[in-house]
């Protein structure tokens, strides 16, 4: 739209059925037309939506330029007329029928929120009839989600927040669930559940926690987590084997076995120095018995560990729920028992065919264990679901704790409430994505200061949405949850009966996500190198604002990049309806992540350096996926891991080209 058009529309006032007067908003027209096309089941109709949208605006421009008001019914009449003029008969009929049903619904339900409920339920029924493969439990789940979502829209969130979500300016994640108290991705503690029933107890905790967490659950540092359990089982097995073998050879009556048991119980490592038993070793044959008993015990523990890990991974991967994502991190415990856990785990991953629902997060450090590097590299080349977290990245280093990522690159580490950095027992409380491409489109012919002014408005809106979600969840009490606040969340032991969970979840993070950041840069800059630098500038700016919000509100605001396909598809669909097909911006089915700006081929070191700079500013992390050639060797892949460390890249996924 040119300046003259903007002037006409800026001065036009829409009169609603209730008599309320609001400013003319062309985006609502685009969304109404898009919904009409969507309800007919037509696919790839963005160009058609945009054409009808432009025709409607043209009609209003030509016929209302000298008027001050337009009725909402008149706008709908114009949409209906243009659908007919453009020969979209099915859409015209669907839109006409929709208006008739809405009129009947408004008569039946006086309250606006009730009317919206009916609209939402009708939409589910329509979708279930259209999709003949819908199962009864899936339709029932959709009904439940819709009721929860519409209740949240009607009674919980502010109208301006809902408008921003529904016009594609932002995307509120977990909108279906957060009012019920559901938390997002969480690094559960698990410290209190590693008993002799492993892996059943971990599996049950992880599975039951899914009823309270809408997101990924990570089992962090499993190569440390299992150590106490394995040491306990090793000591039991070593005493059992030693007793049995000494008895078989007739030595048991001549040795104070109780003292030997006491020595074994004092050991906190698996690589026991048998010389501590010298006073009880009567001869070479007895020493040989000790050596055999020790070796057999270690072997039994390895077998137990392998079987248990396989059961755990298979069980987690095969959970039949709507949200079934898990991650397991490991890789840095270089003790004998730690290496045993790492090697057994990698053996199991190598043996299992498909692990789509369980991601392995392998942690790497400079001068790490080369044997493990080679093993994990072989698995990645075979297509296993493994991602890498670099603990030596400048922003991940800490002398006391290891950083933990989720499989989508999201990160929790810093904590505004204390000096200690940590991840385990913390969660993403809520996430809201800002449609950066929309901002870029609107400011493509404006100054950079105007762009940042509008970005500030969106950041303020996003901050307020996140705070409202935090307060809604924080008002739940400990009794609303059965699993996650039972020694699985940081400081949940301080929660008393009946107490609100606010003081515990405030140690989690409120996630400001930037969606379509690369497309935003393309709208604002034509030169590709300048686009890459602009992306860094924008991330730095938003991160600075997030730090300010954290200090002002004593809450942990972080900045990350949107990686989920669903919001990226929804946002681009809105923008296609409004702006049409724009080269390199809306000429695809889904907005892209910023790693799409790099090919990771000709100048891969320079590309990695850019990624390292981006991730240093993304306090909440981002996902980078590098595609590998089919013929890559273990040596070449290890060089990529070393380059990742050298270039300060904190998190990366490597995928084989198909």
Question: Which ranges hold each PLM region?
Answer:
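Alpha-solenoid helical-repeat scaffolds
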Residues: 23, 46-50, 69, 295, ...
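Glycine-rich phosphate/pyrophosphate-binding loops
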Residues: 524-530
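Conserved catalytic cores of very large enzyme subunits
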Residues: 101-506, 532, 536-658
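Short, hydrophobic beta-strand segments
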Residues: 56-63, 326-330, 519-524, 622-628
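Predominant activation on well-ordered alpha-helical scaffold segments within soluble catalytic domains
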Residues: 27-34, 50-57, 61, 76, ...
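Charged, amphipathic alpha-helical regulatory modules used
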Residues: 2-120
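Conserved phosphate/anionic-ligand binding catalytic regions in large, soluble enzymes, centered on
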Residues: 426, 504-521
């Amino acid at each position: 739209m040119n300046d003259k058009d903007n002037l006409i529309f800026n001065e036009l006032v829409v009169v609603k059925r209730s008599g309320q007067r609001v400013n003319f908003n062309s985006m609502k027209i685009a969304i109404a037309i898009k919904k009409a096309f969507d309800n007919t089941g037509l696919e790839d109709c963005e160009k058609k939506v945009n054409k009808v949208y432009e025709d409607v605006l043209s009609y209003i421009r030509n016929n209302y330029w000298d008027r001050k008001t337009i009725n909402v019914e008149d706008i709908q009449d114009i949409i209906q007329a243009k659908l007919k003029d453009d020969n979209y008969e099915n859409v015209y009929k669907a839109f006409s029928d929709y208006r008739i049903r809405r009129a009947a619904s408004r008569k039946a339900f006086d309250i606006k929120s009730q009317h919206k409920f009916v609209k939402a339920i009708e939409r589910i029924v329509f979708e279930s009839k259209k999709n003949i493969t819908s199962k009864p439990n899936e339709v029932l789940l959709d009904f439940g989600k819709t009721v929860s979502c519409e209740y949240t829209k009607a009674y919980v969130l502010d109208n301006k927040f809902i408008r921003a979500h529904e016009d594609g300016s932002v995307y509120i994640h977990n909108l279906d669930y957060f009012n019920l108290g559901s938390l997002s991705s969480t690094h559960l503690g698990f410290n209190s559940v590693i008993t002799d029933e492993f892996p059943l107890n971990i599996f049950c905790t992880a599975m039951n926690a899914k009823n309270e967490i809408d997101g990924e659950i990570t089992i962090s540092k499993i190569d440390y987590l299992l150590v106490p359990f394995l040491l306990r089982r090793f000591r039991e097995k070593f005493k059992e084997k030693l007793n049995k073998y000494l008895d078989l050879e007739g030595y048991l009556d001549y040795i104070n076995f109780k003292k030997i048991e006491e020595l074994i119980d004092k050991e906190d490592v698996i690589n026991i120095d048998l010389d501590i038993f010298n006073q009880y070793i009567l001869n070479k044959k007895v020493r040989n018995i000790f050596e055999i008993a020790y070796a057999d015990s270690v072997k039994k523990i390895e077998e137990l560990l392998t079987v248990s890990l396989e059961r755990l991974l298979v069980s987690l991967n095969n959970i039949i729920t709507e949200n079934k994502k898990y991650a397991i991190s490991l890789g840095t415990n270089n003790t004998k028992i730690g290496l045993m856990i790492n090697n057994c785990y990698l053996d199991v991953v190598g043996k299992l065919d498909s692990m789509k629902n369980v991601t392995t997060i392998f942690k790497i450090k400079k001068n790490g264990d080369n044997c493990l590097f080679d093993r994990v590299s072989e698995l990645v080349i075979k297509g296993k679901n493994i991602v890498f977290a670099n603990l030596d990245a400048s922003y991940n280093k800490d002398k006391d704790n290891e950083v933990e990522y989720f499989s989508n690159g999201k990160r929790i580490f810093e904590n505004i409430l204390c000096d200690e950095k940590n991840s385990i027992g913390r969660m993403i409380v809520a996430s809201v994505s800002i449609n950066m491409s929309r901002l870029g489109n609107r400011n493509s012919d404006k100054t950079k200061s105007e762009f940042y002014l509008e970005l500030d408005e969106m950041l303020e809106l996003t901050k307020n949405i996140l705070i409202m979600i935090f307060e809604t969840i924080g008002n739940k009490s400990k009794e609303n949850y059965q699993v996650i606040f039972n020694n699985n969340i940081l400081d949940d032991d301080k929660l008393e009966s009946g107490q609100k969970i606010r003081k515990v979840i405030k140690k989690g993070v409120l996630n400001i996500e930037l969606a379509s950041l690369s497309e935003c840069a393309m709208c604002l800059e034509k030169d590709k190198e300048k686009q890459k630098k602009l992306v860094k500038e924008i991330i730095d700016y938003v991160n600075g604002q997030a730090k300010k919000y954290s200090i002002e509100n004593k809450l942990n605001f972080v900045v990350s990049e949107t990686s989920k396909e669903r919001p990226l598809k929804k946002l681009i669909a809105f923008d296609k309806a409004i702006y049409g097909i724009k080269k390199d911006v809306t000429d695809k089915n889904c907005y892209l992540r910023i790693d799409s700006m790099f090919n990771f081929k000709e100048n891969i070191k320079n590309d990695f350096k850019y990624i390292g700079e981006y991730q240093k500013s993304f306090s909440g992390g981002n996902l980078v996926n590098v595609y590998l050639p089919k013929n890559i060797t273990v040596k070449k892949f290890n060089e990529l891991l070393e380059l990742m460390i050298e270039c300060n890249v904190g998190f990366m996924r490597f995928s084989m080209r198909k």
